[in-house]
C-alpha cells in the first residue's frame, strides 16, 4: 500500500479535477476501512526521506486533520478515535514523527512538529506518552542545527496545544531553559534563535513560577530584550511579540524593566522595519489595555489593597510616549483611506494613542494639543490628517469638562474641513473624528451641549453633503449621523432632528442606492444610520416613519424578484435583504405600539409574507434578520400573531434544526420566546414539536454551546405561556435542567470566557425554573414541582458559595428563590429556612446598590415570610 499512498497523495494535488477527486475518494475510503493502517501509512510517508516532498507535506497535513478539528463535536470524535487505537500503532506513529524532526526538508520538519503537538494535546492530559518531553530535550545541545530548530518549534507548538497544568514544573523548567538558551546571542544559527524566540512566545503561559522568581525572570527578560536588537528582522519581531505577551500576562512583574523597554520600543518605532515597529507599538497598547482593565475594575481611582496593582506605567511614560506616537501618525500610506483592511504604523500609533487617552484621561490633553494646533492648517495633507487623527483619538478617556472648550472651538473648523479640504484622507479622518465627538461628547448626560440651535442645521447640512462624497468619506459621514441621532435617544417628546427628519431619511436612502454603495461598507453604514435615526425619533415624526414602511417593503420585494444572479450578485443581494429586514425590525419596534399600532398593523400581512419568502433564499444573515423582525412583529401583534403560525411554524422548526449556522438557531430560540409571550396559551398546539426539537438541541454535541443557555430560558417562556399544561414536558425538561445545574454550579470558570459562559448557562437554567414556577402557580399540579425544591435550593446555595456570579445571575437567582416560595408556599417553608440562600444571599441582595436586585430581593423576602408563616 505504501507506493499506492504516495501516488494517491500526489494525485490528490493534481490540477486534473477527475484525478484529484478519485484520489481524495480513495484516501477517504482507506481511512474509513482501516484507520490504524491509514494513519501509520501517512506517518511512514512523512518520515521517509526518499519520498517526494509534496506527498510528505500532504501526508502530514492529512494526519494533523485526522487529530483535530475546529468544531468541538468533531474534535471530540477524532480524539476518541485516536485514543482507541492499539498501543503498538500509536508507538510506531510517534516514532515516525520524532524521526521526521531530523529530515533535511524544512517544510516536512515543520509539519511533523505540528503533528507531534496535536498528538501531545490528546495524550499528555491522559497521562500517555510521558517520555515525550524528556526525549525532545535529552540531547538538544548536541543536535545538528536543523534538528535543534525543529525540536524547539515542536516545544513551542506543544505549549500552544497543552494546558500548563498538564506539564510538571520540572519539565516546564527544562523547556524554558532549552528555549531561552536557544535564543541566546551565543547561539550561532539564526533559524535556531528564531525557532526558540517563537517557542518562548507560546511557552510564556507556562512560566508563572519562573516569573515569580527574581533571578529567572531577570534572565528571561534580559534574553528577550537582547533578542529585540538581533540583526535579523524576524527575530526582532518575534522578540517584541514576546514582550507584548509578557505585558498582558505578567504586567505586575514589569516595573523593574520599564525604562529599558521604553528605550528599545522607542528605537524600534523610530528606526526599525515596519513589522518590528508595529509590535513595539503593540507593547504599549497591551500595557494600556491592562491598566484600563485594572482601573475600570476598581472604579477609576485605584485602591492599593487590590489583587493586581496599577503601576501607572502609561502615565509615567507620557512625556516620551506621546511624542513617539504622534510621530507615527505622519507615516500614513498614500492609499490607506481606500483600503478597508489597511494596517500600518500610522494606524497602529493612532489606535495606541486612543488607548493611552483611555488609560490616563485628562493628563493626555496638554501633551497632544500643541501637535494638533501646529499641524491642523499646514499645506501638507499628511500633517493635517495626522493632527485630525490625533484629535479624534483622544476623545474617549478625558472628561467632558476637559474637552468641551477645545471641541467647541474645533467644531466649525472640522465642518469646514469636511466640506472643503482637497484631500480625501483628511476628509475621511475628519468625518470619523466628528463621529467620535458625537459618540462621546453629545447626549443627555452632557451638561453643556455641543450641538445647539445655532449649529445643528450646519452639522446636518455638512453630513448630508458629505454623503455624496467618495464612498469612504460618505461611510464615515453616515457613522457620524448615527451617533448624532443616538445622542437624542432620551430627548423627550420633541427632538432637534425633527425639522430635518425627512431630508435625513431621503438622503440616507439615496446613499443606499448609490452605484458604489457596496464599497467601503457604505450601504451597511447608511442603513445602520437610518435605523438609528428611526429608533431615536419621537412621536412628532411617526407619520414619516409610517410612510417609510411601504418604501422599505418594496425594496425587500425587489430583492426577492431577481432572476438568475452570479454568486457575487447573490451575495450582495442577501446582504441587502438582511439590511432591509433589520430596518423593518426597527420600524416594527417603533410603530408597533399605540398610537401608531393600528395604522402600522395594516402592513403586517404583507410584511410577514416577505419575511417568509426571505427564508427561501438560504442566506444565514438574511435568515437571522428576518427571524428577528418576525419576533418584533409577534410582540407587536400579540394574540393576533396566531394567524401566521400555520405557515411560519415550519420555518421556526427549520431554524431550531440549523446546527450548522448556530447563530440562526440561537435567534430562532429567542423568537420562540417572543411568540410565546405574544400568543400565551395559543402556542399550545405547536409545543410538542417545539419542545421535542429543543430537547434534541440540548442533547446534541454538534450544536454550539452558546445556544444552550437560551434554550433553557425558552423552557421558562413556554411554561409561562401554557401554565399547567407544561406538565407533559416537565419529566423530560426537569432532569435536563437538574444535570445542567449540577454541571454549572461547580464549573467555576478557568478563564474569563468560561466564567462568562457559566454565568450565561446558570442564568438560562434559572430563567427556566422561574418560568416553570410562575406558570404552575395556583394550579392543582404544583405538587409535581415539590420533589425538585431541595435540588433547586442546593443549586442556589452552591452558586452563591462559588462567589463568581455576575449581577444578571444574582437578580435571576434571587427571583427564583422568591418564585419557589411564592408557588410552593408552606410545602417548602422549612427547606427554605435551612438554605444559605434565604439568609446570607438574600441579605446581600437586599443591600445591593443595583435597585433591580434590591427590588427582586424585597419581593423574595415577602414571599419567604409568607411561606414560613403559613
Swiss-Prot record:
GO cellular component labels: cytoplasm; nucleus
Task: Report the residues modified as N-acetylalanine.
Answer: 2
State where the protein is found.
Answer: Cytoplasm; Nucleus
For whether the record's keyword set contains Cytoplasm, the answer is: yes
- MF GO annotations: small GTPase binding
Job description of the protein = Acts as a negative effector of drought tolerance. Involved in the regulation of stomatal closure and in the abscisic acid (ABA)-mediated pathway that lead to drought tolerance. Does not directly mediate nuclear import of ABI1 and ABI2 which are key regulators of the ABA signaling pathway. May be involved in nuclear translocation of other type 2C protein phosphatases that mediate ABA signaling.
The HEAT repeats extend over: 4-33, 35-67, 87-126, 132-161, 172-204, 214-249, 255-304, 313-361, 365-395, 403-440, 456-492, 498-535, 542-588, 596-637, 642-679, 684-722, 730-776, 826-868
Q: Which organism is it from?
A: Arabidopsis thaliana
Does this UniProt record's set of keywords contain Nucleus?
A: yes
User: Example GO biological process term?
Assistant: protein import into nucleus
The knockout outcome noted for this protein's gene is:
Delayed development and flowering, reduced length of leaves, stems and siliques, increased sensitivity to abscisic acid (ABA) and increased drought tolerance.
UniProt-listed InterPro entries? ARM-like (IPR011989), ARM-type_fold (IPR016024), Importin-beta_N (IPR001494), Importin_beta (IPR040122)
Family named by the database record: Belongs to the importin beta family. Importin beta-1 subfamily.
- Which residue numbers delimit the Importin N-terminal domain? 23-103
Pfam families linked = HEAT_EZ, IBN_N
In Swiss-Prot or TrEMBL terms, this protein is called Importin subunit beta-1
Which coarse location class applies to the principal site listed for this UniProt protein?
cytoplasm
Q: Which keywords does the record carry?
A: Acetylation, Cytoplasm, Nucleus, Protein transport, Repeat, Stress response, Transport
Q: Name the tissues where it is expressed.
A: Expressed in roots, cotyledons, leaves, stems, petals, stamen, stigma, siliques, embryos and guard cells.
* Signal sequence, renumbered to the chain: none
Q: What interactions and quaternary structure are annotated?
A: Forms a complex with the importin subunits alpha IMPA1 or IMPA2, the nucleoporin NUP62 and the Ran-GTP-binding proteins RAN1, RAN2 or RAN3.
Amino acid at each position: 500500500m505504501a507506493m499506492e499512498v504516495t501516488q494517491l497523495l500526489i494525485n490528490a494535488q493534481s490540477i486534473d479535477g477527475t484525478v484529484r477527486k478519485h484520489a481524495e475518494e480513495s484516501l477517504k475510503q482507506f481511512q474509513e476501512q482501516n484507520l490504524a493502517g491509514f494513519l501509520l501509512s501517512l506517518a511512514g510517508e512523512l518520515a521517509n526521506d526518499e519520498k517526494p516532498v509534496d506527498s510528505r507535506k500532504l501526508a502530514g497535513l492529512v494526519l494533523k486533520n485526522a487529530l483535530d478539528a475546529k468544531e468541538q463535536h468533531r474534535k471530540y470524535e477524532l480524539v476518541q478515535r485516536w485514543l482507541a487505537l492499539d498501543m503498538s500503532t500509536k508507538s510506531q506513529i510517534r516514532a515516525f514523527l520524532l524521526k521526521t524532526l531530523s529530515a533535511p526538508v524544512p517544510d516536512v520538519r515543520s509539519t511533523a512538529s505540528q503533528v507531534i503537538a496535536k498528538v501531545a494535546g490528546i495524550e499528555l492530559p491522559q497521562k500517555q506518552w510521558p517520555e515525550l518531553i524528556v526525549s525532545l530535550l535529552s540531547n538538544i545541545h548536541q543536535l545538528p542545527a536543523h534538528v535543534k530548530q525543529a525540536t524547539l518549534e515542536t516545544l513551542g507548538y506543544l505549549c500552544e496545544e497543552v494546558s500548563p497544568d498538564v506539564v510538571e514544573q520540572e519539565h516546564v523548567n527544562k523547556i524554558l531553559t532549552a528555549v531561552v538558551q536557544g535564543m541566546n546571542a551565543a547561539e550561532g544559527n539564526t533559524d535556531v534563535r528564531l525557532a526558540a524566540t517563537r517557542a518562548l512566545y507560546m511557552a510564556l503561559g507556562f512560566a508563572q513560577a519562573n516569573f515569580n522568581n527574581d533571578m529567572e525572570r531577570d534572565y528571561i527578560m534580559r534574553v528577550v530584550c537582547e533578542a529585540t536588537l538581533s540583526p535579523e528582522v524576524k527575530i526582532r519581531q518575534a522578540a517584541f511579540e514576546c514582550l507584548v505577551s509578557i505585558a498582558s500576562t505578567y504586567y505586575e512583574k514589569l516595573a523593574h524593566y520599564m525604562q529599558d523597554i521604553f528605550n528599545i520600543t522607542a528605537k524600534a518605532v523610530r528606526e526599525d522595519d515596519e513589522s518590528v515597529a508595529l509590535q513595539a507599538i503593540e507593547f504599549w497598547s497591551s500595557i494600556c489595555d491592562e491598566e484600563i482593565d485594572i482601573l475600570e475594575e476598581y472604579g477609576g481611582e485605584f485602591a492599593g489593597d487590590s489583587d493586581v496593582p496599577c503601576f501607572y506605567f502609561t502615565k509615567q511614560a507620557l512625556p516620551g510616549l506621546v511624542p513617539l506616537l504622534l510621530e507615527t501618525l505622519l507615516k500614513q500610506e498614500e492609499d490607506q483611506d481606500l483600503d478597508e483592511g489597511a494596517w500600518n504604523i500610522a494606524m497602529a500609533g493612532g489606535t495606541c494613542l486612543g488607548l493611552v487617552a483611555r488609560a490616563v484621561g485628562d493628563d493626555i490633553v496638554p501633551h497632544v494639543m500643541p501637535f494638533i494646533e501646529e499641524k491642523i492648517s499646514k499645506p501638507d495633507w499628511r500633517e493635517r490628517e495626522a493632527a485630525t487623527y490625533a484629535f479624534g483619538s483622544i476623545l474617549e478617556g478625558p472628561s467632558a469638562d476637559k474637552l468641551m472648550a477645545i471641541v467647541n472651538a474645533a467644531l466649525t473648523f472640522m465642518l469646514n474641513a469636511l466640506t472643503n479640504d482637497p484631500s480625501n484622507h483628511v476628509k475621511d479622518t475628519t468625518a470619523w473624528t466628528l463621529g467620535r465627538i458625537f459618540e462621546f461628547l453629545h447626549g443627555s448626560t452632557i451638561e453643556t451641549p455641543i450641538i445647539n440651535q445655532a449649529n445643528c442645521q450646519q452639522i446636518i447640512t455638512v453630513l448630508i453633503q458629505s454623503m455624496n462624497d467618495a464612498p469612504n468619506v460618505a461611510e464615515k459621514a453616515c457613522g457620524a449621523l448615527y451617533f448624532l441621532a443616538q445622542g437624542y435617544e432620551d430627548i423627550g417628546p420633541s427632538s432637534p432632528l425633527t425639522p430635518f427628519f425627512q431630508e435625513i431619511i431621503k438622503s440616507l436612502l439615496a446613499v443606499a442606492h448609490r452605484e458604489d454603495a457596496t464599497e467601503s461598507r457604505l450601504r451597511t453604514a447608511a442603513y445602520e444610520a437610518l435605523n438609528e435615526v428611526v429608533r431615536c425619533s419621537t412621536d412628532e415624526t411617526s407619520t414619516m416613519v409610517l410612510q417609510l414602511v411601504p418604501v422599505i417593503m418594496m425594496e425587500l420585494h425587489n430583492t426577492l424578484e431577481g432572476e438568475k444572479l452570479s454568486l457575487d450578485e447573490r451575495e450582495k443581494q442577501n446582504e441587502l435583504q438582511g439590511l432591509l429586514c433589520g430596518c423593518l425590525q426597527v420600524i416594527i419596534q417603533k410603530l408597533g405600539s399605540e398610537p401608531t399600532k393600528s395604522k402600522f398593523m395594516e402592513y403586517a400581512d404583507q410584511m410577514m409574507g416577505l419575511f417568509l419568502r426571505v427564508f427561501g433564499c438560504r442566506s444565514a444573515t438574511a435568515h437571522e434578520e428576518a427571524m428577528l423582525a418576525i419576533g418584533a412583529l409577534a410582540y407587536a401583534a400579540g394574540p393576533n400573531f396566531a394567524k401566521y403560525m400555520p405557515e411560519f411554524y415550519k420555518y421556526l422548526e427549520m431554524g431550531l434544526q440549523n446546527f450548522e449556522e448556530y447563530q440562526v438557531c440561537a435567534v430562532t430560540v429567542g423568537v420562540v420566546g417572543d411568540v410565546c409571550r405574544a400568543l400565551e396559551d395559543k402556542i399550545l398546539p405547536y409545543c410538542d414539536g417545539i419542545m421535542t426539537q429543543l430537547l434534541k438541541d440540548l442533547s446534541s454535541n454538534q450544536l454550539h454551546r452558546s445556544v444552550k443557555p437560551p434554550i433553557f430560558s425558552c423552557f421558562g417562556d413556554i411554561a409561562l405561556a401554557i401554565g399547567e399544561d407544561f406538565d407533559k414536558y416537565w419529566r423530560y425538561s426537569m432532569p435536563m435542567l437538574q444535570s445542567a445545574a449540577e454541571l454549572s454550579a461547580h464549573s467555576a470558570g478557568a478563564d474569563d470566557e468560561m466564567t462568562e459562559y457559566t454565568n450565561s448557562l446558570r442564568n438560562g437554567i434559572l430563567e427556566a425554573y422561574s418560568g416553570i414556577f410562575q406558570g404552575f402557580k395556583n394550579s392543582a399540579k404544583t405538587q409535581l414541582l415539590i420533589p425538585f425544591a431541595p435540588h433547586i435550593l442546593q443549586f442556589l446555595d452552591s452558586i452563591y458559595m462559588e462567589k463568581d456570579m455576575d449581577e444578571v445571575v444574582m437578580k435571576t437567582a434571587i427571583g427564583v428563590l422568591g418564585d419557589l416560595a411564592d408557588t410552593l408556599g408552606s410545602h417548602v417553608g422549612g427547606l427554605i429556612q435551612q438554605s444559605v440562600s434565604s439568609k446570607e444571599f438574600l441579605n446581600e441582595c437586599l443591600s445591593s446598590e443595583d435597585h433591580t436586585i434590591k427590588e427582586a430581593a424585597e419581593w423574595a423576602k415577602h414571599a419567604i415570610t409568607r411561606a414560613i408563616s403559613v
